[in-house]
Amino acid sequence: MSFDDPLTQAYLNVMKKSNSPYLGLTVDTGIFCKRHPRVSTNYFRFLGANEEVIQYIDHIFASGTDPKRYFAEKNQEGQMFPEELQALIRSNHDFEYAMFSTGYEMSDYHILDEYIPYIKHIHGKIYEMTEEGVEYSISFEEVIEYLKNAGYDGYISTEYEGNRFELPDHPIRDKENVIAHQRMLKKYLGE
């Protein structure tokens, strides 16, 4: 869940007040997407999503924000999406693509500043490792640099979620993606 979600905020308040070594955070790096995951885009494109909806979402990321924040700024009360996006939605696939796009956040790394002492674990979310050995949507080089500078001294695991977007009759490359992610982590950690 997002750091601005009321349930997350309630948990954070309890965590801080109790200051127990048994309460902490597991941060999901999916909150640091720089781009919409390409595997999701390709999957919805395969299903027939309107290319204009796809481009609309890509433009939001390219502008330096994410759909969740952009929609919150542009929406009129009672509407899920801005009017210009609603006009482009022609099918359930378009609607789902736009709705799910709000789950890929572009948070500033410093959102973690006050929580570093409470972070017990990092879920290194990956959707697609490229041939160049980097995650397509998330800059792990930047994430790890931030965590090092902030004093984080815990674990980063690999959480592969690209499998949910694999096209029919295509192999799920889960092992290959996890291995590539672990190699990338070692490289950025200097191991």
For the regions a language model picked out, list residue spans one by one.
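Active-site segments of SGNH/GDSL-like serine hydrolases
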Residues: 1-2
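Histidine-acidic metal/acid-base catalytic patches
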Residues: 5-191
